[in-house]
Amino acid sequence: MASPTIAANAYANLARVLENSGAGKGSEASGQSFASLLKDAVGSVMESGRKSDAQTVAMAAGKANVMDVVTAVADTDVAVSTLVSVRDRVISAYEDIMKMPI
């Protein structure tokens, strides 16, 4: 179950991505490329996974709180779910483009 903190972080990340990508600015070339945006998103998911793994190892060693581990795992779950959703939308858009007549 998503907590308000996770939702707030997701909205903040989305706002940052939209701000950095230049959404709504037309076709200006000053924003990031789509490839670098995806690379950053995947890197963010990987970092979230690493933090989750580190928290799990720390809990197994008796050095971490269970709540911290649950929060880290939930954050990773949200990040992976978001990434999978974006992947599905990109594939769907690609398939729609391929169906267009030339």
From Swiss-Prot:
UniProt cross-references to InterPro entries, sorted A to Z: FliE
GO molecular function, one term: cytoskeletal motor activity
Keyword presence, Ribonucleoprotein: no
Pfam annotation, one family: FliE
This protein's record includes keyword Disulfide bond: no
NCBIfam families: fliE, PRK00732.1
Protein name: Flagellar hook-basal body complex protein FliE 1
Organism listed in the record: Bradyrhizobium diazoefficiens (strain JCM 10833 / BCRC 13528 / IAM 13628 / NBRC 14792 / USDA 110)
